[in-house]
Amino acid sequence: FSICFGDLLFFCTATIQGEENCMELQIYHSVNEGLYLWNGTSGLLIDGLHRGREIGFSDTSEQYICMMRQGRSFFAKPNDLLFTHIHEDHYDQALVDEFQQRYPGRIVYAPGLDKDNIQPVVLEHGIARMQIEEYEVYAFTTVHDGKIYEDEPHCSYLIRWKNRWIWVSGDAILVPELADRIRTYTGQDNVWKAFVMVYQISSESGKAFLKKLVPEQICLYHLPYPEDDRCHFCNLAEQKCRQCKAEGLPVKMIESDSFIDS
């Protein structure tokens, strides 16, 4: 009999807050841009099955793969998969295939993926809506950062659960006009958490986007485990977080393999 270390962490958290009556959305960050949203009855895994070590990021941990294969912890209840794009540090075809074999019928969606099993409803040019369990998901067609990637399919996501709005940037170029489009959907509500990566908070347009969006919390992700960080992304992230704080943007660098504070 084997058990994953993460099972204990998840069990304790769910027990303390009440798994059946969880009134608060919990978010767990694995590594790279992996996010797991849990509302007490169903989960949404975003960019969570991937590789990346060969390009200076990290592979999905063995702990996480163990949970998927044994149907434990995060994978003990219904889960669906969402991807911002299919670069290797976000998406691994072999792991996705294994997920679909073990959990047939669960939703898998990524822009440009020919195996999608959900059809988004187009609301306007560049914005489509999906209902995934209790999660209302708005897919914004965005442009991947970097000239060589600009023609590759990429989506950023605005996700609503009850009165909580979450913005998941992926690797998009962020511009102030995008914040205006997001606000047309959130209305008077604030974005609860906005997830951004280091290149976005390094650019003037990315910082202008955040100043216009005014999320309650700015979370910096897309960082590898320290042992995989051969490109020194973590040092750069710490430096950029300090610069943003000096400019009035309190960016929080979130830890890998941990729940994000409410």
What positions do the PLM features span?
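Short, Lys/Arg-enriched N-terminal segments with co-localized hydrophobic residues
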Residues: F1-C22
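Conserved beta-strand hairpin/beta-sheet module of binuclear metal-dependent hydrolase folds
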Residues: M23-Q70, E150-D171
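Binuclear metal-ion centers of metallo-dependent hydrolases, dominated by the metallo-beta-lactamase
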Residues: Y28, Q119-I132, D151, L210-S262
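Pre-active-site segment of Zn-dependent metallo-hydrolases
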Residues: S42-L82, A94-D97, I173-Q188
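Active-site neighborhood of phospho(di)ester-bond hydrolases with catalytic His/Asp-centered motifs
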Residues: I46-D47, P78-D89, Y109-P111, W167-A172, ...
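Active-site environment of divalent metal-dependent phosphoester hydrolases
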Residues: R53, I86-Q93, K115-N117, A128-M130, ...
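Active-site-proximal loop/helix segments of hydrolase catalytic cores
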Residues: H144-L213
